[in-house]
């Protein structure tokens, strides 16, 4: 299976949805499924699904469809879920704690190694047996523990400073929950989760019927 060059971000963002739904099929002991059946369940057209998957190889068989387990494993491999990623959370407030306690991350290979906060009253408190540390120790911790992913859950005013510490520590990717677009070097990958923007999109959809 060889990844083709120039895969669009739209295709990449659809892959996790395929992966999640295929897992549900396996949990229900469903062994195979057609692109048409996938289309009806996921909401993308059958043609779109086939085009997406063809970007990475030929997975289906005409007249048979897709082997669910095989496709699940192939998509997991494409997404990079075949190894572990050492991860830290910065910001031990409500969002940070919710992420730390989300068990599926560990199953997917995201290994939480450290939690950091700026509030001294939080230091030493444990979440999932991991003690919250002073954010001033972040850069050295990232360097010493081969941390690849930093999850930023701090207020907007502190987010860029935290980001800079992560970058200086050698981080490779940032999952950003702060309502700010971070300034990072070109080789650092950032995935933003701006909750207020998602809510505003929902409000628009509640008030308009012009979305195709």
UniProtKB/Swiss-Prot annotation:
A Pfam family per the record: Put_DNA-bind_N
Cleaved signal peptide residues: none
Keywords tagged on the record: Cytoplasm, DNA-binding, NAD, Repressor, Transcription, Transcription regulation
Taxonomy, superkingdom: Bacteria
Any GO molecular function: DNA-binding transcription factor activity
GO cellular component assignments: cytoplasm
NAD as UniProt keyword: yes
SMART domains, alphabetized: CoA_binding
GO BP, sorted A to Z: negative regulation of DNA-templated transcription; response to redox state
Subcellular locations according to the entry: Cytoplasm
Family (UniProt): Belongs to the transcriptional regulatory Rex family.
Matching PANTHER family: REDOX-SENSING TRANSCRIPTIONAL REPRESSOR REX (PTHR35786), REDOX-SENSING TRANSCRIPTIONAL REPRESSOR REX 1 (PTHR35786:SF1)
Function: Modulates transcription in response to changes in cellular NADH/NAD(+) redox state.
Name recorded for this polypeptide: Redox-sensing transcriptional repressor Rex
């Amino acid at each position: 299976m060889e990844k083709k060059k120039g895969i669009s971000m739209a295709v990449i963002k659809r892959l996790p949805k395929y992966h999640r739904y295929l897992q549900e099929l396996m949990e229900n002991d469903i062994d195979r499924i057609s692109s048409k059946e996938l289309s009806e369940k996921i909401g993308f057209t059958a043609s779109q699904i086939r085009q997406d998957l063809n970007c990475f190889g030929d997975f289906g068989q005409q007249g048979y469809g897709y082997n669910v387990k095989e496709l699940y494993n192939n998509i997991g491999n494409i997404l990079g879920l075949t190894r572990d990623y050492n991860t830290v959370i910065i910001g031990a407030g409500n969002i940070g704690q919710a992420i730390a306690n989300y068990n599926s991350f560990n199953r997917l290979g995201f290994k939480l190694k450290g939690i950091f906060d700026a509030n001294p009253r939080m230091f030493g408190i444990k979440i999932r047996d991991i003690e919250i540390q002073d954010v001033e120790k972040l850069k050295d911790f990232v360097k010493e523990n081969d941390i690849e992913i930093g999850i930023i859950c701090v207020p907007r005013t502190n987010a860029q400073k935290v980001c800079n510490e992560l970058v200086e520590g050698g981080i490779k990717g940032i999952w950003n929950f702060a309502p700010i677009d971070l300034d990072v070097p070109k080789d650092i990958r950032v995935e933003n989760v701006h909750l207020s923007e998602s809510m505003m999109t929902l409000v628009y959809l509640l008030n308009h019927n012009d979305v195709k």
